[in-house]
């Protein structure tokens, strides 16, 4: 009996991304996210029930049609939270690498389990760059902001440092929440310890996602 081909739930695809890693990126927005960040601009990616089922081959075929555009870039998995579908994500990145396409993962790191890294190890073997979102340095504030502790985020950051995986840190600046002196000083001190960090991206808060909240009936 033939094996069922692995599929992922994909929210959307962007063929000309310029802010999700180096060069021009083919950006895959994964469906589903365990966090509920108060400033999230993609609330329509939260629930796993949304999106469209796709195979890795279907996505790779779309990229390779115009692969010359991505010669200095590659594919970026974002979301939502791509690591929520880690098996499919690993298959997608494996096939991308087989086709000579560089890979980047945009993640909040919240699903990393330091006691069980087997699947993460396999994923990192086919991941060229990690874009790690640090939402807030202080745990209680992180819980208020996202609904979760930041312990696993920092555990993931330390794991990436240990394996020497290149990382770009991303931090959204929200006035009165993540743009306080003590929080920024703590962030700066921590980033100095990340020997694998290549870049810090400070992202301004925007309200472009408001229309999505209105259409979804989310306060």
Map each language-model feature to its residues.
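N-terminal [4Fe-4S]-dependent radical SAM core
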Residues: 1-30, 34-52, 65-71
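Residues at secondary-structure transition points
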Residues: 19, 24, 49-50, 54, ...
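Class I S-adenosyl-L-methionine
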Residues: 207-215
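Short glycine/proline- and charge-enriched loop/turn segments
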Residues: 43, 214-219
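Short acidic donor-binding/metal-coordinating loop in glycosyltransferase active sites
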Residues: 79-80
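Conserved AdoMet/S-adenosylmethionine-binding subsite of the radical SAM
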Residues: 64-74, 83-208
